[in-house]
UniProtKB/Swiss-Prot annotation:
Residues that bind Zn(2+): 188, 198, 201, 204
GO MF entries: ATP binding; ligase activity, forming carbon-nitrogen bonds; zinc ion binding
Cofactor mode of binding and number, as noted: Binds 1 zinc ion per subunit.
Reaction(s) this enzyme catalyzes, per UniProt: 7-carboxy-7-deazaguanine + NH4(+) + ATP = 7-cyano-7-deazaguanine + ADP + phosphate + H2O + H(+)
Gene Ontology process terms (BP): queuosine biosynthetic process
Job description of the protein: Catalyzes the ATP-dependent conversion of 7-carboxy-7-deazaguanine (CDG) to 7-cyano-7-deazaguanine (preQ(0)).
Cited InterPro entries: QueC, Rossmann-like_a/b/a_fold
Family membership: Belongs to the QueC family.
Residue sites binding ATP per the record: 9-19
The protein's name: 7-cyano-7-deazaguanine synthase
Disulfide bonds: none
Organism: Geobacter sp. (strain M21)
CDD domains assigned: QueC-like
Gene name per UniProt: queC
Length: 225
């Protein structure tokens, strides 16, 4: 019987590659997306359109509103920085977001009798978010196996991070080798009303850098600067 895996799937470059990797590894992918009040709602439209064509057995969209808490340029009126990737944790960091996302994934995994979760975090070409680091994932996996019925019964739950040590260029090359169509992904934090990527936020800059280093043209549409 094919093993199930819950895939955290935003509709972005990394999570789409992650879904393709899980499928290649023989898992039946269950895609999990979140509408949490993010200003870049375009990613959800992409996720809804492409989860099943990408091979997801099911696609669950969970809705909650982190705008009530604020604290991030992605969930409040704070301006999205456009001056480049800096050294400090940027204002686009959403407090505890991956902890929240993984908790929903953990709950759905238990319901599905599933012991594998995939998340597309990356610790090389990234914005410096603390919940994208290997130490965080390791600690969360330890907690998950202490806090669940499956873990207590010895059915070890594993959090897979296949992109954690890859550059953005390597992620793109991996995805292309698996047939990922990157025109059907969205990365921009501050897109135009027509969906065009800004080309200047951290996420756009990292994406463009990755495509340039991979020697591939980015197929998404950008605003004319």
């Amino acid at each position: 019987m094919q093993k199930k895996a819950v895939i955290l799937y935003s509709g972005g470059l990394d999570s789409t590659t992650c879904l393709a990797i899980a499928k290649k590894q023989g898992f039946a992918p269950y895609a999990l997306s979140f509408s949490y009040g993010q200003r870049h709602q375009q990613e959800l439209e992409v996720a809804k359109l492409n989860a099943r064509p990408m091979g997801a057995v099911d696609h669950l969209l969970v809705e909650f509103d982190l705008r009530k808490m604020g604290g991030s340029a992605l969930t409040s009126d704070i301006e999205v920085p456009k001056e480049g990737v800096g050294e400090e944790i940027p204002v686009t960091y959403v407090p505890a977001r991956n902890t929240i996302f993984l908790s929903f994934a953990l709950g759905w995994a238990e319901t599905l009798d599933c012991f594998d979760i995939f998340i597309g975090v990356n610790a090389l070409d990234y914005s410096g978010y603390p919940d994208c680091r290997p130490e965080f994932i390791s600690a969360y996996e330890t907690m998950a196996n202490l806090a669940t019925k499956a873990g207590v019964e010895g059915k070890r739950l594993q959090i897979h991070t296949p992109l954690i040590s890859l550059t953005k260029a390597e992620i793109i090359q991996k995805g292309i080798s698996l047939g990922v169509d990157y025109s059907k992904t969205h990365s921009c934090y501050d897109p135009a009303e027509d969906g065009a990527a800004c080309g200047r936020c951290d996420s756009c800059r990292l994406r463009l850098k990755g495509f340039a280093e991979a020697g591939v043209t980015d197929p998404v549409r950008y605003q004319k600067l």
